[in-house]
Amino acid sequence: VSDFAALSFESSSERPRAMVVGGRTIDGTAVNTRWNLEYESSEGYRIADFSIEQPSFNSLTGTAIIQYDGRLVMFGGVDNDLQWRSDILYSDDEGMNWYVPDTVHNKLPETYASRQNPTVVVDEKQNIYVIGGQSFSGSYSDVYRGYLNELKWAALND
């Protein structure tokens, strides 16, 4: 599998956890898998396939996931019908369920183009940086900075 998103984080139960979402199989098919790996000292590693629990999740490739404000947040990606995503997805339950949040305060600026494989990082002041990515026609070199739940997104390289 290629073009998947991966994130390691501390779960709400304060245990190490990793999440692997989506991707593309060797024949080019996008998948909707969401693997969750959690470590518990008494049991070792446990793995769960959330796509069995919630199969309605769209197949996606080329997304990026961060942990922010107690939830997981997904940016970008392409579905199996080659539809590019520009919306932001939230998960309040560590990757089991995903939804589009209130788009009044949780959307990227009009100048942001849909893309796959962006790099997304959070700094110590809780600024989110969405950096670059790819489209069918090439690569992006733009950088956007903002906060979730606020209309303060800005392109940094205009």
Indicate where each model-derived feature is located.
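Kelch-like beta-propeller repeat domains
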Residues: 1-158
